[in-house]
């Protein structure tokens, strides 16, 4: 397997220096590229992320019901949230993919990016311990944990963007599918989202049109909050 370039730079972006860089390399390796891929690390990272976020919400909202806690956790650990984190880290620049995935734009696919985030969490746990993971994840999620509230319907990104623009009496966003790749059973959709307040369009890539629209809408919301 070829070495993945610029791992020290990625470590700085993540805020964690690996003692064993082979773990990070494995976390970035898709199953299409090598036998030693990231799926087991993803399994581990998914569980660690769930317990850390559950613990944070439990202590942050002592009066919240189990239902509210579950809904907030689902919002924070779902695929589109992980995809936004992956994009912030520019993980697509570091992924090791097989030729087929590379050709079909796998470095932009939301499921691959989200899985890579979970795999990196698993790799950090194996390289350190649960407490290190907890502190790092709370740093990654600081802004999202500060904004989330119980008792509030955890609306999807498209709904939130629409309501935000309507509140300002602005035109609604325009979504256009600009590319579809892959076989019928394994397609990748690229969707462009345009709004009047941004000079450039924002792109979302996912395994369905709806997911791609959600990803694009979430990125627009992030830009509008800056």
Curated annotation (Swiss-Prot):
Domain RNase III intervals: 7-129
Binding-site positions, Mg(2+): 42, 115, 118
Single Gene Ontology MF annotation: ribonuclease III activity
Pfam families: dsrm (PF00035), Ribonucleas_3_3 (PF14622)
Major location (coarse): cytoplasm
Residue intervals of the DRBM domain: 156-226
Compartments in which it is found: Cytoplasm
Cofactor dependency: Mg(2+)
Coiled-coil regions, chain positions: none
Keywords of this entry: Cytoplasm, Endonuclease, Hydrolase, Magnesium, Metal-binding, mRNA processing, Nuclease, RNA-binding, rRNA processing, rRNA-binding, tRNA processing
Record-annotated active site: 46, 118
Single GO cellular component term: cytoplasm
Subunit relationships: Homodimer.
Protein family membership: Belongs to the ribonuclease III family.
HAMAP family named among the record's database cross-references: RNase_III (MF_00104)
Protein purpose: Digests double-stranded RNA. Involved in the processing of primary rRNA transcript to yield the immediate precursors to the large and small rRNAs (23S and 16S). Processes some mRNAs, and tRNAs when they are encoded in the rRNA operon. Processes pre-crRNA and tracrRNA of type II CRISPR loci if present in the organism.
Name listed for the protein in its UniProt record: Ribonuclease 3
Source species: Shewanella sp. (strain MR-7)
